[in-house]
C-alpha cells in the first residue's frame, strides 16, 4: 500500500516551495502500448503524475516529449497540469505517513537544484523502476521507488486474468 495520502489543495497559493505535488493522469498518457493493458495495471484507469513545487508557479518533474527523452526538468504549473488527464484540474499535496522520513523543504529544493543542473545523472524512464513518482519521492525522502508501481505489480499478481 501507499505510505502517503494525496490531499486536495485549492491551488499553488496553498503550497510551499519544496512540497511534493501530484495531478491525476490517464494511463494512455504513459505509452500507447499500455492502452491495451489498462486492466492489468489498475482497477482504475489513471495514475498520479508527481513533481516538486518550486516557486513562481514552477514545478520540477520527470518528463519529456516521449519516454525515451524523459529527464528531470522544470515547467510551469499549467504544463504540469497538461501532463494530467486534461479534464481534472485538481492539485494534490503528497503527505507521507509518520513512518517515512521526509526531508525539509530546503533540503528538497537543494536536491532539485543539483539534479536540474545535471539531469543526465538521473537514469532514464522505466515504468516500474524509474518514473515521475520515484523521482519526486527521491527528492522529498531520499527513497527511490514508486508506490503506484508497487501497487500495480501487486494487482497484476493477484488479479484474475478473466472476470
Label the predicted regions.
Residues 1-163:
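Cysteine-nucleophile amide-bond enzymes
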Amino acid at each position: 500500500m501507499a505510505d502517503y495520502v494525496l490531499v486536495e489543495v485549492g491551488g499553488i497559493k496553498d503550497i510551499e516551495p519544496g512540497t511534493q505535488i501530484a495531478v491525476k493522469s490517464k494511463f494512455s498518457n504513459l505509452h500507447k502500448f499500455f492502452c491495451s493493458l489498462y486492466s492489468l495495471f489498475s482497477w482504475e484507469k489513471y495514475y498520479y503524475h508527481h513533481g516538486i513545487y518550486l516557486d513562481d508557479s514552477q514545478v520540477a518533474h520527470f518528463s519529456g516529449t516521449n519516454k525515451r527523452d524523459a529527464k528531470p526538468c522544470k515547467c510551469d504549473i499549467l504544463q504540469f497540469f497538461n501532463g494530467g488527464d486534461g479534464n481534472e484540474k485538481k492539485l494534490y499535496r503528497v503527505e507521507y505517513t509518520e513512518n517515512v522520513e521526509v526531508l525539509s523543504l530546503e533540503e528538497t529544493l537543494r536536491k532539485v537544484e543539483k539534479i536540474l543542473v545535471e539531469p543526465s545523472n538521473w537514469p532514464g524512464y522505466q515504468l516500474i523502476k524509474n518514473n515521475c513518482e520515484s523521482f519526486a519521492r527521491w527528492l522529498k525522502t531520499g527513497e527511490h521507488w514508486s508506490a503506484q508501481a508497487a501497487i500495480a505489480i501487486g494487482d497484476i499478481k493477484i488479479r484474475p486474468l478473466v472476470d
